[in-house]
Every structure is written in structure tokens, then in C-alpha cells.
Amino acid sequence: MFSFFLENQTITDTLQTYIQRKLSPLGSPDYAYTVVSKKNPSNVLIISSYPDEWIRLYRANNFQLTDPVILTAFKRTSPFAWDENITLMSDLRFTKIFSLSKQYNIVNGFTYVLHDHMNNLALLSVIIKGNDQTALEQRLAAEQGTMQMLLIDFNEQMYRLAGTEGERAPALNQSADKTIFSSRENEVLYWASMGKTYAEIAAITGISVSTVKFHIKNVVVKLGVSNARQAIRLGVELDLIRPAASAAR
């Protein structure tokens, strides 16, 4: 769905200018407006004042799949500061993304959350840094209602620019319906999440053990994690795993 913005720099610039104008009363802080498809989190829109190099790195590594800020937002509706305990999974280590973000002075922030009508997760993150750190943090906490309405406004502007109410709506909706996993990948991951061994999964699904391992490897790559256990945990946390058709047999 969000490829439309990647392919149309004028529309992207229009949305970015709008966001920056609305945030200017706060002193034009660094920000990120991020939208992630709940059905396929590999689909992401990022409109941000962060350095271009960091955004390219973030996209290339699909960091939204393991970003603690994103993962926390999936499970809540209220705003939160980054200094809270936002790690959802004790066996997933986020040292890579944290160490990299520090190089771009992206360390402390405040995030507002919106679960929208198109089954997407929208976030507005404001970076807190510099001499005015305390003042900005206090203001963001005090004006949560105003900031939340700004996020809603930004999200509506995004859909308006994308034309979901116009002639591009069918194509956008069709793209949004695509899931992150193929049916076979989902089936294999489902049975793995139910505690089945690779041999048991192979017997249930009628494929070879090597094919089961092949699909698990694809899932691990898509989710940007290190192993099957982490893939299962992340799939469960993000509600990406659907009951397999073979479960009804």
C-alpha cells in the first residue's frame, strides 16, 4: 500500500511539509510518523526528519519488525515514553537497532499510538534531546490529547493523499490484503507454534522435513530474527499466525 509514497516524492513532500508545519509550535522537534500494516508488517511508511541514512538503513533491515517502540505500540493504545520498559520479548535482543540509532542521536523519545480503520498501526514519535529536553518532555506529557489529535490528523491526511477515497482505493486495498506469510509458511509456523517438531509438521502437512525447514528459514528471514523460536514468539506477539487449514483435518 505504502509504495505509492515511495514512488511519488511530491506527495511524500506534501505530507512531510504538513506534519512539520503542525509540529512547529513545539519548536520543530525531530519526529517520525510511521504506519505499519498489521497484516503484513513488512509494509511500512516512514515520514520523518531523521537523517536519510538512518531511514534507508531502517528500511533495508526491516527494523520495524524488531523495533521495541513498534512492538510496544502493537500492544497498547496509550502514549508512552521510551524510557519505560518497552521490551516485549526477553529472548529477543535489540542491541543492534539501539546501538545504530545512538549513532544518529535517536535515543529518547515519546510515542503516540493509533490503531486505524484500515487495520494499520500509526505512530507519531517525537525525539527528546538537547538543552530543552526536560521542558519538551513535560509538554509532550501534558498535551497528550493535542498530540493524539495531531496523529489522527496526520493519518487522515496520509489516506487523503494516497487517494483511498478516490480512484486508487481498490488497488490500495488489494495491496493491503496481502499477508506477510504465504499459506504454506503460515501453516508450518502455526504447527511450530503449537509445539510440533519438524518431523511432526512434515507428517501433518504432507511435505518433507527439508521443505519444512525451508519454509521456517523463509519466515525467520521475513521477520528479521535469528531463529525459529524468535520467529514463533514474534509471530504470536504481532498476531500474524493464523490457524492452519490442516488443523481442521
Swiss-Prot record:
<comment type="similarity">
    <text>Belongs to the autoinducer-regulated transcriptional regulatory protein family.</text>
</comment>
<dbReference type="GO" id="GO:0006355">
    <property type="term" value="P:regulation of DNA-templated transcription"/>
</dbReference>
<feature type="DNA-binding region" description="H-T-H motif">
    <location>
        <begin position="198"/>
        <end position="217"/>
    </location>
</feature>
<keyword id="KW-0804">Transcription</keyword>
<dbReference type="InterPro" id="IPR036388">
    <property type="entry name" value="WH-like_DNA-bd_sf"/>
</dbReference>
<keyword id="KW-0673">Quorum sensing</keyword>
<keyword id="KW-0238">DNA-binding</keyword>
<dbReference type="InterPro" id="IPR005143">
    <property type="entry name" value="TF_LuxR_autoind-bd_dom"/>
</dbReference>
<dbReference type="GO" id="GO:0003677">
    <property type="term" value="F:DNA binding"/>
</dbReference>
<keyword id="KW-0805">Transcription regulation</keyword>
<dbReference type="InterPro" id="IPR036693">
    <property type="entry name" value="TF_LuxR_autoind-bd_dom_sf"/>
</dbReference>
<dbReference type="Pfam" id="PF00196">
    <property type="entry name" value="GerE"/>
</dbReference>
<dbReference type="InterPro" id="IPR000792">
    <property type="entry name" value="Tscrpt_reg_LuxR_C"/>
</dbReference>
<comment type="function">
    <text>Functions as a potential OhlL-responsive transcriptional regulator.</text>
</comment>
<dbReference type="InterPro" id="IPR016032">
    <property type="entry name" value="Sig_transdc_resp-reg_C-effctor"/>
</dbReference>
<feature type="domain" description="HTH luxR-type">
    <location>
        <begin position="174"/>
        <end position="239"/>
    </location>
</feature>
<dbReference type="GO" id="GO:0009372">
    <property type="term" value="P:quorum sensing"/>
</dbReference>
<dbReference type="Pfam" id="PF03472">
    <property type="entry name" value="Autoind_bind"/>
</dbReference>
<protein>
    <recommendedName>
        <fullName>Transcriptional activator protein EsaR</fullName>
    </recommendedName>
</protein>
<dbReference type="GO" id="GO:0042802">
    <property type="term" value="F:identical protein binding"/>
</dbReference>
<keyword id="KW-0010">Activator</keyword>
